[in-house]
Curated annotation (Swiss-Prot):
Belongs to the Syd family. GO terms for cellular component: cytoplasmic side of plasma membrane. Its main location: membrane. The keyword Translocase does not apply. This is Protein Syd. InterPro entries: Syd, Syd_sf. It is a peripheral membrane protein. The keyword Cell membrane applies. The gene is syd.
Amino acid sequence: MDDLTAQALKEFTARYCDAWHEEHKSWPLSEELYGVPSPCIISTTEDAVYWQPQPFTGEQNVNAVERAFDIVIQSAIHTFYTTQFAGDIHAQFGDIKLTLLQTWSEDDFRRVQENLIGHLVTQKRLKLPPTLFIATLEEELEVISVCNLSGEVCKETLGTRKRTHLASNLAEFLNQLKPLL
C-alpha cells in the first residue's frame, strides 16, 4: 500500500466531509447513490442517502486489472481504489472542477475494475500509453488519470494523446484538492 496516497486521500475526504458539515450540518448527501447498497450509508431520505467514508473491506488491490493485461499497476492506484468506501467527491484542482471517483461498495469495486480494464483496452487498441482514471470532468471526453508508466497525474482527453501534467504523483494531487460543495 502507498501510505502517502492513503493518507492524502483520507485527509482530503475528511476536509470534504468537514466542509459539507460546516455548510449543511450533516454528513454528505447523495441522490445519485440512493437505492444502491453500501457500508457508507448512515441514513436514507425518500430520495437520497447520507454517507460517511468507511474502511475498505475487500482485497486491497486491483489485481483483476493487472491480470487482464499482464502488467503491474502503479501502487498509488491500488491504494486509491482500496483505502476506503465513500461516495464520489466533488473537488477543484486549480481552476479544474472534477468529481473524484470512489468505490461505494464491494460490488462497485468490481465494476470499477471492469471499467479500468475497458479503458486500458481502448488505449491499447489506439496505441496510447496506459493511464488509469481517478476523476471525471464536466467535459465528457476528459478525465483525470494516473499515467501507469510514470505515476504522474494528468488531465487526459480520451482517445487522444492530449494530456496535461497536473502533479508528479497521486498524493501530491490529492493534497492540492479543494472540496466543492
